[in-house]
Amino acid sequence: MIDTTRYPRLSRIQTPDDLRRFDEAELTAIAEELRSYLIESVGKSGGHFAAGLGVIELTVALHYLYQTPVDQLVWDVGHQTYPHKILTGRRDQIHTVKQKDGVAPFPKREESIYDTFGVGHSSTSISAALGMAIAAQRNGDDRKVVAVIGDGAMTAGMVYEALNHAGGMDPEPNLLVILNDNRMSISEAVGGLTKMLGRASGSRTLNAIREGGKKILGDKKNNPTARFVRRWEEHWKGMFVPSTLFEEMGFHYTGPIDGHDLPSLVGALKTLQTLKGPQLLHVITTKGKGYELAEGDQIGYHAVGPFDPSKGLVAKAGAKKPTYTDVFSDWVCDMAAAEPKLLVITPAMREGSGLVRFSKEYPQRYFDVAIAEQHAVTLAAGMATQGAKPVVAIYSTFLQRGYDQLVHDVAVQQLDVLFAIDRGGVVGPDGATHAGNLDLSFLRCVPHMVVMAPADEAECRQMLSTGVQYQGPAAVRYPRGTGPGVALDASLATLPIGKAQLRHSGTRIALLGFGATVDAAEAVGRELGLTVVNMRFVKPLDKAMLLELAKTHDGFVTIEDNVVAGGAGAGVSELLNAEAITMPMLHLGLPDSFQHHASREDLLAEAGIDQAGIRAAVLKRWPQLMTSKTPALNAAAG
């Protein structure tokens, strides 16, 4: 807990109603307390950091002027919402963020009535807010709906689908879009749109031009003078800022204004509250504002572990096991040296996907397409048609956004694209929106796909090399964090497609492990004298080995860190069924529910796919394994 006596104003705020009881003149002091409180709290707990510091003033202004939760705020992405959570009844719990049974790291409707829309992925806010505004309009509600979007989210196509719809509606929706322009996603924001918005940042000319035009026009809208003034205004606006992009889509554009100047923010929002129809307010903010170290290293302070704010982040001393992301990072540089056709694509995840080194060593072969997963996948498809060897480095959860392109543009054409899928399976503290628990199911059903899941770091490297050499679409899906710590070498050795590895020869029951579950399965198998197989390939399965094991064993247990429905275990059952083989099966995996936020270890234990859970499930199904050495267990299996 934090001593709130050092925050005399903030300690009096439990809800936005309390905030609105303060005089407007005190808002700047409240913002300063909120920023200090956030720094102290995240220092104790860890969590998303720099993005929240950048929206302190905006958060205070919005909750002060709008009658939340009647008026509705929709936050894009959501990693900037810790200040919002502090002002909406969760101040004294914010130190539990990301912890089991603690505050969620992103807006979550089940957690608070002030969290109007669940989020974690980018670029959804305008669509959701427009839907709310339309529903309110149909119900006769006069509520206001505000979408706050930024952190690189304006690069995704979904944003422009929503803007296009909102700007062309009749009657016009009561919608305000706030563009929080901080030049960042997690890494630096990239692309032509970012450059265009950047040109607006220094322009104070636009508003002078617009206001001058209004004074000349007065109430005249359609006479020759008015038409001339509008043409003159548009000509000069186009020379200075991108407002015409939004205004041509039907939005009234205001800005850019300083997002850390509370009086200016309050004044602009008060004006916008009097206007009808779709509005767009462009604010310029600094990610990490108010904490010098975060302002200087916005990427490093995007998300942090617990740290001492007086010292900043301190690198941990001593050698550490490489993460799977580190393994990919080294492999992709080694493969690029050996394969000149290799190109790498990432949707705004250079740091998270381990591509910093590659981007520096091979800048002409590195393509950060910004938050644009659909484009990333089809870009790779286009490259592959010309003989390139593209690798799409992407998180499992974000690949969901490019699934149609994976099917329609890559798999149907059987193109040579490798998907390096990080954060597969149980991810942990970021919760349901960032979990990778569906990928084996949605990849396994795609024709022509080869799907691999490594049991350790060395195997991950071999599978990546296998995927590059394979003629067709391939995916290597690996978990967050470290593996068992096996030795690595610099070779680019490959694996035979569709061949499993026998880890331990036993009797009676065969444990078939996929990916990160193999080590736990092997420990159980050795203890109970059971056969253990590292399946390696989710598709194609090692048919020959499975049929041979079916002849000599009385039951199969499949283990995966993916939902059971449609997953790797389902593939084993389908194979046996096609061969008219009937035998007892036990499928262990993730349940038919979305993951909550907790540590990876807690979630694996809850799902029963850690060592203790696997052992308990096997003995519950075949209790004779504790005492009996008899191989015939079919009767006991029921």
Swiss-Prot record:
Its cofactor is Mg(2+); thiamine diphosphate. GO terms for molecular function: 1-deoxy-D-xylulose-5-phosphate synthase activity; magnesium ion binding; thiamine pyrophosphate binding. Binds 1 Mg(2+) ion per subunit. Gene3D superfamilies: 3.40.50.920, 3.40.50.970. Mg(2+) binds at residues 151, 182. It is an enzyme of class 2 (transferase). Keywords: Isoprene biosynthesis, Magnesium, Metal-binding, Thiamine biosynthesis, Thiamine pyrophosphate, Transferase. Its EC number is 2.2.1.7. Pathway: Metabolic intermediate biosynthesis; 1-deoxy-D-xylulose 5-phosphate biosynthesis; 1-deoxy-D-xylulose 5-phosphate from D-glyceraldehyde 3-phosphate and pyruvate: step 1/1. Pfam families: DXP_synthase_N, Transket_pyr, Transketolase_C. It catalyses: D-glyceraldehyde 3-phosphate + pyruvate + H(+) = 1-deoxy-D-xylulose 5-phosphate + CO2. GO terms for cellular component: cytosol. InterPro entries: Dxylulose-5-P_synthase (IPR005477), THDP-binding (IPR029061), Transketo_C/PFOR_II (IPR009014), Transketolase-like_Pyr-bd (IPR005475), Transketolase_BS (IPR020826), Transketolase_C (IPR033248), Transketolase_CS (IPR049557). GO terms for biological process: 1-deoxy-D-xylulose 5-phosphate biosynthetic process; isopentenyl diphosphate biosynthetic process, methylerythritol 4-phosphate pathway; terpenoid biosynthetic process; thiamine biosynthetic process. Thiamine diphosphate binds at residues 79, 120-122, 152-153, 182, 291, 373. Coiled coil: none annotated. Belongs to the transketolase family. DXPS subfamily. Catalyzes the acyloin condensation reaction between C atoms 2 and 3 of pyruvate and glyceraldehyde 3-phosphate to yield 1-deoxy-D-xylulose-5-phosphate (DXP). Homodimer. NCBIfam families: dxs, PRK05444.2-2. This is 1-deoxy-D-xylulose-5-phosphate synthase. It comes from Xanthomonas euvesicatoria pv. vesicatoria (strain 85-10). The gene is dxs.
